[in-house]
Curated annotation (Swiss-Prot):
<dbReference type="Pfam" id="PF04208">
    <property type="entry name" value="MtrA"/>
</dbReference>
<comment type="subunit">
    <text>May be part of a complex composed of 3 subunits; MtxA, MtxH and MtxX.</text>
</comment>
<keyword id="KW-0489">Methyltransferase</keyword>
<comment type="similarity">
    <text>Belongs to the MtrA family.</text>
</comment>
<dbReference type="GO" id="GO:0032259">
    <property type="term" value="P:methylation"/>
</dbReference>
<protein>
    <recommendedName>
        <fullName>Putative methyltransferase Mtx subunit A</fullName>
        <ecNumber>2.1.1.-</ecNumber>
    </recommendedName>
</protein>
<keyword id="KW-0808">Transferase</keyword>
<dbReference type="GO" id="GO:0008168">
    <property type="term" value="F:methyltransferase activity"/>
</dbReference>
<dbReference type="InterPro" id="IPR030688">
    <property type="entry name" value="MeTrfase_MtrA/MtxA"/>
</dbReference>
Length: 172
């Protein structure tokens, strides 16, 4: 279940529950989490749409139309509807595995719970193994000389958590 920009209490009967406010990373995270569980066959998109980003509209568009060669979500009107961290294969798996239920604008917790109850036991598990997507983290290069370590690892080593670099304590 995707609650978009709304803050709604979690529904214990939903296999997965969370908000999404962006049409790129938010959509990517939904896809990666859904395809990692072959038992998820329905995704309820509800709550208030995020202005400008249109995460809900983009999720509907990627499910219906996929992405082009540049990773743009075909048919999305979001501000930056580009998928950069998952493959077209992962998008296709999402399209095949789930049915997306468009209830954008629905904020009534009781109606949402009813929909979850109606769909939680429908359908068989997707007939393929879960798909795991691992994207390498993009690392920012730091040219600054550290002046302090904000994480003490031991009496001998400290780490600058912003740069992600470990130093000997005596070098600072």
């Amino acid at each position: 279940m995707v609650t978009l920009a709304s803050h709604l209490d979690a529904c214990p009967d939903a296999a997965i529950w969370g908000s999404s406010k962006t049409e790129n990373l938010g959509v990517e995270k939904i896809i990666v989490n859904v395809i990692s569980n072959s038992n998820i066959r329905y995704v309820l998109v509800c709550g208030t749409e995020s202005r400008g980003h249109l995460a809900g509209h983009s999720l509907l568009a990627i499910h219906a139309n996929g992405i082009d060669e540049q990773g743009r979500i075909t048919g999305s009107q979001g501000a930056i509807p580009f998928i950069e961290n998952i493959s077209g294969t992962a998008v296709e798996r999402f399209q095949q595995q789930v049915t997306v239920l468009n209830r954008i604008g629905l904020n009534d917790p009781e109606e949402i719970r009813r929909i979850v109850e109606d769909y939680r036991d429908k359908g068989e598990a997707y007939p393929e193994e879960p798909m795991l997507v691992c994207a390498p983290k993009k690392r920012q290069t730091s040219f600054a000389v550290p002046t302090s370590g904000d994480v003490i690892i031991s009496g001998e080593f400290v780490m600058d958590s912003k740069a992600g670099i470990i130093y000997t304590a005596e070098s600072l």
